[in-house]
């Protein structure tokens, strides 16, 4: 029987309302959408869905309010086959939702209603499960959770992937160096103040890193392995 890699994904999950339009307006206006989709979103949640669609087994670990939006977020993940048994439902909290305009060139405009009532506490995380996983993934939206997960992954000697998309530069760099495979967005890497990507990636490399990468949109992806870029 073929082994299915098991990946734990920790971080944000949202409910995205996506409006496809010809162009994103630059001035106030009323206009109709070409298409409307309601779907799950959030970096960690989407990573879990990607793992499942690629043939792996995925668990999503994160915090969700006990509101209607939270119910919809979990239904979307369950429909994709993602294990949500370790999601922490927070009484009285507001789950995160976003309205997203996407034009015909693929450009986007996002307006998010942030989650409310999400404590930073990590004591509920079932970190003993990490030893049974093949890899872990975390985004930058819940930093204490990412640190706890990456430390558990290091103890279990398994790879850890960090989606370094946004946040305080010093905090994000600290977390990135606790992962084996951090990948920065280009704006996040720029915010570190290390210069152009080919200079910044080697400077960001450190700690537990096996590789350190950056996504550059249509220009592709660069990574540094400690010797070569």
Give the ranges of each region predicted by the language model.
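Residue-level marker for the onset of beta-strands and adjacent loop->beta junctions
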Residues: 47, 96-98, 210
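Short Asp/Glu-rich motifs
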Residues: 70-71, 95-97, 172-173
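Glycine-rich phosphate/adenosyl-contacting loop at the front of the ribokinase-like
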Residues: 1-63, 68-72, 79
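Short, glycine-/polar-rich solvent-exposed loops and beta-turns at beta-strand/coil boundaries
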Residues: 91-93
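Ribokinase/PfkB-type carbohydrate-kinase core domain
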Residues: 1-13, 75-89, 100-229
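Thr-Gly-centered strand-to-loop micro-motif
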Residues: 34, 41, 96, 138-139, ...
């Amino acid at each position: 029987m073929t082994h299915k890699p098991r990946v734990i994904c920790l971080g944000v999950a949202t409910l995205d309302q996506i409006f496809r339009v010809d162009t994103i307006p630059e001035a106030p206006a009323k206009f109709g959408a070409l298409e409307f989709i309601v779907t799950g979103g959030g970096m960690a949640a989407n990573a879990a869905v990607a793992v499942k669609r690629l043939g792996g087994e995925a668990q999503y670990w994160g915090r969700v309010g006990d509101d209607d939006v939270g119910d919809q977020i979990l239904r979307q993940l369950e429909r994709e086959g993602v294990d949500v048994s370790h999601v922490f439902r927070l009484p009285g909290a507001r789950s995160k939702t976003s309205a997203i305009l996407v034009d015909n060139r693929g450009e986007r405009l996002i307006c998010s209603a942030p989650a409310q009532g999400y404590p930073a506490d990590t004591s509920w995380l079932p970190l003993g499960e990490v030893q049974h996983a093949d890899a872990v993934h975390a985004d930058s939206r819940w930093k204490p959770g990412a640190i706890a997960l990456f430390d558990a992954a290091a103890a279990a000697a398994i790879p850890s992937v960090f989606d370094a998309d946004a946040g305080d530069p010093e905090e994000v760099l600290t977390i990135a160096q606790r992962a084996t495979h951090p990948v920065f967005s280009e704006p996040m890497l720029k915010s570190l103040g290390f210069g152009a990507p080919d200079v910044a990636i080697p400077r960001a490399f450190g700690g537990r890193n096996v590789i350190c990468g950056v996504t550059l949109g249509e220009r592709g992806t660069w990574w540094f392995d400690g010797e070569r870029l």
